[in-house]
């Protein structure tokens, strides 16, 4: 019996013997900006199939890690649904075609995997006579086990137009015990669990035109995908993927941690399978650099992880456990994916932090969902308002899918449309709140300008002064104008770097450039007029503020050094999440799960400053995207790059794709100083820093503060720490003494209060106000008085910071008078709110002027109850 690892190895070996080149699995974060995650084995090769790029070699084979969450709710319920899965694939880019693809798949399935030929079935596209003929003549496959299927099952296309073609699928018949009878075939009703697809062969041979007609492609391609989990189940004689050697050790670990037994009942099986699948998905996602967040791929990770945590609760396990599952996943998959072992500690940390966050709100979220469902069912309804599911998501971080799953378990429908409407409403508010850079109607103007003149020629990499012909002049606000020239040395804001500033002038005109933006590579200069009025079709001198440009360039190059240093000290999971570079400072947002320590920040500063002192040359070059990748250039996932990219290289340290302006030698940065580090969103941190003279000023300010402290403490630099520690120790002793005095004073005041208590109906009553008591002080007084009196009612107020009340009633009297009732009356009269238990309650008030009225009314209530 072959193991999962052996199946992988044999697949790659088989196709390498057929002259295929083995490509390592690509990241789950694809280069394709249209995709959040790698969802199929062909995703890394999409540009070659679409003809956007030339393939590096004609034949390729891979095992590719993939993630799909479109049917997340089915994961755990069925034997074969997964979020994470592996696709074995062989690909041809204009090389071999149907005959070889079919013959080799048959050879591998029957001779290498040794699957019983009599159990195999094949599907082909309705009109694909060629594929059927190859199966029959080349593989000696029986025609009666070939089923022709329509476009929805056996046709692949990249979209409504473009590359497309028929498919042929290999299925395994598990037997009539899984549906149908001896005459059943693929596609018959009730046979979904009987005929299991294990391999899909896609023959990309057509180009669909706008009118729907098909034209033959000049180069025909092969794209195949075989699900490793399904193949392992068939080869190992399992009807459930979770019982294969790929997943069962992880499932056993889930049972061991949660104290649950697989096979005990369907509910336990369901939850254990969810945890097993999701532990694998979470481990691989975090390993590839995904951080939990509320959007994009980070939200997909969060949904998967939180669903698993909930299923731990369903098994009765309330402690953290998902981070512990990481070890078993790594142990199982590190042979095929060795980087898992290198990153295991980082993965555990990120998973644990996210699990801790959610555990704090999970029970509350589940309780709220169930309360809402109880209310519905009590009133004979079964539809949950979308506003409720949105509130759970927005306020408590409770994923919509969990609300939906809990509701479904109780027979309630969640109104998804209402939830999505609330989400869209929130997004619209966010969109409206953003600053609009271009005025209304500007977009259509840009389109017209582009059609007429094309793009602006940018000369700013080579020079900071140039002449440009004014092609367009549009009035903005406050004597500002938007100017577009045929060419410009002014850098337009992009890639986090702000636009250049400077001046534009001629003999009879002068204007100050405040900002430069671009749309469709058309550079739009925002100019404040200082003299005269510019005219279209005239040539003007364009001059960049070189001091600001140089300072901005220093900060931009320093940002690259910071990025690299972060990855060295914090971990390679660090990815850029945003940046801002101007002449005064730099700001860098990055993916990370916790605050950086002072030690880490110090090391990062040291690395950057050490590099600056080395005075390394900064080299800018242009390469194809493939060449840039070979150079190890860092690039932003999700960004769309052209065929030729600009590479900024600090030799031996940092290599990044970047379109910004940089200094030619990092020694010119002078000094690098981090000024702040903090969180800006879940899983995203921000560092702000200064360079050069700005960094010197920060250092000087800190030195001046230190000098001032030394003078005040009469200390020197060498004994300052010792002096501060001594003063802190003295302060601590003084605070202890003060606390003892306060306790003595409180005891004295309490005794005085007790001696002054009046008696109403045989009950000791104290109603008093204090100016310098905290709510905790009031509570202590009440407890002391109650301890010394069998029957007592204490009503206290404090006006220390704001009006506050505390009321105590001995338990011998709570059947007659409740502290909560008295405190509510006090709060009501003074315009506040409060409540509590029958024996103790607290409240806040707003109107101190009503305090005596409140005391008077409470006294009357007490007298009425006791006399």
Curated annotation (Swiss-Prot):
Keywords (A to Z) from UniProt: Aminoacyl-tRNA synthetase, ATP-binding, Cytoplasm, Ligase, Metal-binding, Nucleotide-binding, Protein biosynthesis, RNA-binding, tRNA-binding, Zinc
Residues that hold Zn(2+) according to the record: 556, 560, 658, 662
Cofactor(s) needed for function: Zn(2+)
Cofactor mode of binding and number, as noted: Binds 1 zinc ion per subunit.
The keyword ATP-binding appears for this protein: yes
A GO CC term attached to the entry: cytosol
Reactions it catalyzes: tRNA(Ala) + L-alanine + ATP = L-alanyl-tRNA(Ala) + AMP + diphosphate
Coiled coil: none
EC number(s) stated in the UniProt entry for this protein: 6.1.1.7
One record GO biological process: alanyl-tRNA aminoacylation
SUPFAM superfamilies reported for this sequence: Class II aaRS and biotin synthetases, Putative anticodon-binding domain of alanyl-tRNA synthetase (AlaRS), ThrRS/AlaRS common domain, Translation proteins
Location(s), subcellular: Cytoplasm
Cross-referenced InterPro entries: aa-tRNA-synth_II/BPL/LPL, Ala-tRNA-lgiase_IIc, Ala-tRNA-ligase_IIc_anticod-bd, Ala-tRNA-synth_IIc_core, Ala-tRNA-synth_IIc_N, Ala-tRNA_ligase, Ala_tRNA_ligase_euk/bac, DHHA1_dom
Gene Ontology molecular functions: alanine-tRNA ligase activity; aminoacyl-tRNA deacylase activity; ATP binding; tRNA binding; zinc ion binding
Domain notes: Consists of three domains; the N-terminal catalytic domain, the editing domain and the C-terminal C-Ala domain. The editing domain removes incorrectly charged amino acids, while the C-Ala domain, along with tRNA(Ala), serves as a bridge to cooperatively bring together the editing and aminoacylation centers thus stimulating deacylation of misacylated tRNAs.
Function of the protein: Catalyzes the attachment of alanine to tRNA(Ala) in a two-step reaction: alanine is first activated by ATP to form Ala-AMP and then transferred to the acceptor end of tRNA(Ala). Also edits incorrectly charged Ser-tRNA(Ala) and Gly-tRNA(Ala) via its editing domain.
Family: Belongs to the class-II aminoacyl-tRNA synthetase family.
Protein name: Alanine--tRNA ligase
Organism of origin: Fusobacterium nucleatum subsp. nucleatum (strain ATCC 25586 / DSM 15643 / BCRC 10681 / CIP 101130 / JCM 8532 / KCTC 2640 / LMG 13131 / VPI 4355)
Organism placement in taxonomy: Bacteria, Fusobacteriati, Fusobacteriota, Fusobacteriia, Fusobacteriales
